[in-house]
């Protein structure tokens, strides 16, 4: 009788441990997406910035001449950042387009140090030369640091690199070797 009770307690504990681990993994959508395709890059489109494109008087150095995040976009970026920080995935490098909406998104994620990279800049309205952006991005993708790199960019750049169209705040895990993609969201 005692052996049956011990065995039953063991089996019940095993079920709860397995169930708990499954729930924890299901809630860590970032790690699940990266693991699903052995991704070495995660692209993220900047958080919500209402409108399309940028004003005609756009200048890279002046955020007042650009389409920027609104309060909903700021909240979205902060929520996504909280999910990333809760995740088991740690980024070896975090890069952002030089556009203000991408830099603000990256800052609001609340991650460690990050830097801008012109190979992530938008070529939607020809404020950046598409061929130059794609060439810089491809060189970077061919020479990544070990680990997983986060790249905060624009819909046109992410689509050019991965073939995936993304909404504001959406992410695409990308395996640079196999070219596999896995689109997901964290908000």
Language-model segment annotations:
Residues 10-20:
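Sec-dependent N-terminal signal peptides
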Residues 1-11:
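Positively charged n-region of N-terminal signal peptides that target proteins for export
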Residues 117-123, 127-134, 138-141:
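All-alpha RGS (Regulator of G-protein Signaling) helical domain and cognate RGS-like helical scaffolds
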Residues 27-126, 164-187:
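Active-site-proximal alpha-helix that buttresses catalytic centers in soluble enzyme cores
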Residues 22-26:
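Sec/Tat signal peptide C-region and signal peptidase I cleavage site
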